[in-house]
Structure formats: structure tokens, C-alpha cells
Curated annotation (Swiss-Prot):
GO terms for cellular component: mitochondrial matrix; mitochondrion. This is 3-hydroxyisobutyrate dehydrogenase, mitochondrial. One of its GO terms (molecular function) is NAD binding. The gene is HIBADH. The active site is at 209. It comes from Homo sapiens.
Length: 336
């Protein structure tokens, strides 16, 4: 696999790995060029919308997996493919010294690491524990302290790119932790993402992710508002989207993940807002941004409004829909 580890100048403070060439596709095929000797089992905990395709990409690169999910049905296809399924995070830690967790909330992460049957019950010294959940940076820091007491290494590595990028192996990972361990983390994360960025100490990966998702929420609401206004002014939605995407208003929410049904194929808005990134999770991430803004005394006027909107959506029946359903919410709710 052609890849490069690029070290930018000291002024930029940015260290990242970027894959320039993707390996040929193949279902669960070992296509990574690393030596077979490096393919020791990797633990993977959390097989939801993101964790499932991430784990599959590790399999495609030849890594045997030790699997756990709180919902046994989520493990079935991996078991059918020959991967080992165990009954707790502690059992994962007993069998693997490199573990990736991908969980919905801070509470889930705390339980997976510090619970009665958590990773820390059986973690081996020298193990590398990578948490790709999006959680409170303060929780990441506390988990890192507990992991360090056990002689292991913890890194936070939340992701950006959504389900589509998870499936194609083109996620962006934002990594926080001891810099000397970055190369070890990159070996695994590079099988699931095309960009692996070192952000700094533990918690900085989460900080970067929270900032990104706050901006994403704001831009999605703005795109939905602009599209709704244009449609009500008589513009064809496809034409309006085309104009926006060749103009200064262009953004990811307008050109890659448009919230208006019928404008794009292959996005949640084309499937009654099913799949994708849930409204509940966006509300959760905006809550993390709100908490961080409060603790750092940072004004986030639009971020706070976005948080209110997504909380309102959850209360009005949109909790299981993709976060781009804010367009549908604006169309149907006229009492603002």
C-alpha cells in the first residue's frame, strides 16, 4: 500500500499520515502490504453504524479480530466470517493487546473501560487502547489516567467522514495521546482512514472532533434554511443546490450531503432520512461542545442555537432520523 508519513514544519505543529493510493477492493481480503507477522489479533468493541464497517476494513487488511458488542446480533456476521466473539470487554483485553472502541456516549465508554467487566479488569501491560468514540475530552483524560495506572497506553481517535467514509476506508482520524505511540496507532487507523492526524495530548482529538461537529451542525441548519427559503420563493431545489455549489455558499452539507429529498442519490435525505448520523448523536455532540464552551468561557452563539434545535428535534420525533432531517423539521414546523 503506497502511503506517506508527512512531517510538516515546526510552525504548523501538525503531524499526519495520508494514504495516497487505495488498495484494491475485496471482501474481507488481506490487501495490506504489511508483513503477516504484524497481523496479531486486534480487539474491536462497538459494532454500530460506524464500528461495523471500520471493523470490516481491518479484516480486509488481514487483521484477525476479537469482537464484542452489547448487542449479540451485531456480532453474528463477524462470527460467520470466522472472527472470534467474546462475552465482555474484559475478555477482549485478555485476548488482544491492541483494542479499538467505537461507542455512542461517554457513559458507554466509561462502562467499556472501567465497568465490572471492562477492559481494565484484564488489560495487559503495554497494550494500546484506541477510543474512536466521540466523548467529553475530560472523560478521555480520566480514562487515560486509569489506563496508565495499569501500564497500558490510551489514545483518543474520534473520526470524521460518516458511514460512507467508514465503508470506503476514507475516514479522518483525529488522534490525541503520547506522540511516541502515534506510529503504532497509525498502523491500525490507516487501514480504516485516509487521513490520520496527530493533534496533541490526550483529549485534543476529542476537542478537534467536537469543533468539527459543531460547525457541521451549523452548516447543515444553514443549508436546510437556505434550501427551504429558496423552494418557497419558487426555485427548483436541484437548480438551487447547483447554484449554491458553484458559489460562495458551498459547503459539505450542500454538495455532499444535501438535506433536501430528490436533490442527491445515496444520502439519507433520499431514503426518508434513514441511516447516516443520528439526530440524537448530533444533539449529544453539541452538548459536549456546549459543556466545553462553558468550561473555557468561549462564546458559541450559533453552536448553542444549533444545540437547542437538535434537542427540539429529538423531542418532536426526529431522534432516530439522520441529522439532515432538520430540513424536514423546518418544513413541517412553522411555529418559530
Amino acid at each position: 500500500m503506497a502511503a506517506s508519513l508527512r512531517l510538516l514544519g515546526a510552525a504548523s505543529g501538525l503531524r499526519y499520515w495520508s494514504r495516497r493510493l487505495r488498495p484494491a477492493a475485496g471482501s474481507f481480503a488481506a490487501v495490506c502490504s504489511r508483513s503477516v507477522a504484524s497481523k496479531t489479533p486486534v480487539g474491536f468493541i462497538g459494532l454500530g453504524n460506524m464500528g461495523n464497517p471500520m471493523a470490516k476494513n481491518l479484516m480486509k487488511h488481514g487483521y484477525p479480530l476479537i469482537i464484542y458488542d452489547v448487542f449479540p446480533d451485531a456480532c453474528k456476521e463477524f462470527q460467520d466470517a470466522g472472527e472470534q466473539v467474546v462475552s465482555s470487554p474484559a475478555d477482549v483485553a485478555e485476548k488482544a493487546d491492541r483494542i479499538i472502541t467505537m461507542l455512542p456516549t461517554s457513559i458507554n465508554a466509561i462502562e467499556a473501560y472501567s465497568g465490572a467487566n471492562g477492559i481494565l479488569k484484564k488489560v495487559k501491560k503495554g497494550s494500546l487502547l484506541i477510543d474512536s468514540s466521540t466523548i467529553d475530552p475530560a472523560v478521555s483524560k480520566e480514562l487515560a489516567k486509569e489506563v496508565e495506572k495499569m501500564g497500558a497506553v490510551f489514545m483518543d481517535a474520534p473520526v470524521s467522514g460518516g458511514v460512507g467514509a467508514a465503508r470506503s476506508g476514507n475516514l479522518t482520524f483525529m488522534v490525541g495521546g503520547v506522540e511516541d505511540e502515534f506510529a503504532a496507532a497509525q498502523e491500525l487507523l490507516g487501514c480504516m482512514g485516509s487521513n490520520v492526524v496527530y493533534c496533541g495530548a490526550v483529549g485534543t482529538g476529542q476537542a478537534a472532533k467536537i469543533c468539527n461537529n459543531m460547525l457541521l451542525a451549523i452548516s447543515m441548519i444553514g443549508t436546510a434554511e437556505a434550501m427551504n427559503l429558496g423552494i418557497r420563493l419558487g426555485l427548483d431545489p436541484k437548480l438551487l443546490a447547483k447554484i449554491l455549489n458553484m458559489s460562495s455558499g458551498r459547503c459539505w452539507s450542500s454538495d455532499t450531503y444535501n438535506p433536501v429529498p430528490g436533490v442527491m442519490d445515496g444520502v439519507p435525505s433520499a431514503n426518508n432520512y434513514q441511516g447516516g448520523f443520528g439526530t440524537t448523536l448530533m444533539a449529544k455532540d453539541l452538548g459536549l461542545a456546549q459543556d466545553s464552551a462553558t468550561s473555557t468561557k468561549s462564546p458559541i452563539l450559533l453552536g448553542s442555537l444549533a444545540h437547542q434545535i437538535y434537542r427540539m428535534m429529538c423531542a418532536k420525533g426526529y431522534s432516530k432520523k439522520d441529522f439532515s432531517s432538520v430540513f424536514q423539521f423546518l418544513r413541517e414546523e412553522e411555529t418559530f
